[in-house]
Amino acid sequence: QNXLDFHR
């Protein structure tokens, strides 16, 4: 899982 997934 990518912590940068917040950019959605």
From Swiss-Prot:
Example GO BP: oxidative phosphorylation
Membrane topology: Peripheral membrane protein
Keywords recorded for this protein, A-Z: Membrane, Mitochondrion, Mitochondrion inner membrane
Domain of life from the UniProt record: Eukaryota
Main subcellular location: mitochondrion
Family statement: Belongs to the cytochrome c oxidase subunit 6B family.
The protein, known as: Cytochrome c oxidase subunit 6B1
Species of the source: Rattus norvegicus
